[in-house]
Amino acid sequence: MATSAAVRDDEPATKFAKDQLKSIIERIERLEEEKKAISDDIRDVYAESKGNGYDVKALRTIVRMRKQDPNERAEAETILETYMQALGMI
């Protein structure tokens, strides 16, 4: 009988844990949907820019570069330039 009493004592905690888990899963699912919608919007903007004659690859590169820290970007550009000079590309 002690076992059944212990199970009854755990039921509210178990229900809380189940509700909390369900809430977490639903939040993740909602965020995944939002992420997909944003991804679709970004793809549409790139398609629009391509339709207007812009080079999408260059745009993606610029977006990636703008995300970088200016010092890190400068360092990467210096290294790239050094390598290109060593290969006689510039």
From Swiss-Prot:
Q: Name one GO molecular function term.
A: DNA binding
Instruction: Read off the InterPro entries from this record.
Output: GapR-like, GapR-like_DNA-bd
Similarity section: Belongs to the UPF0335 family.
Q: Which NCBIfam families match?
A: PRK13694.1
Q: What is this protein called?
A: UPF0335 protein bsl7135
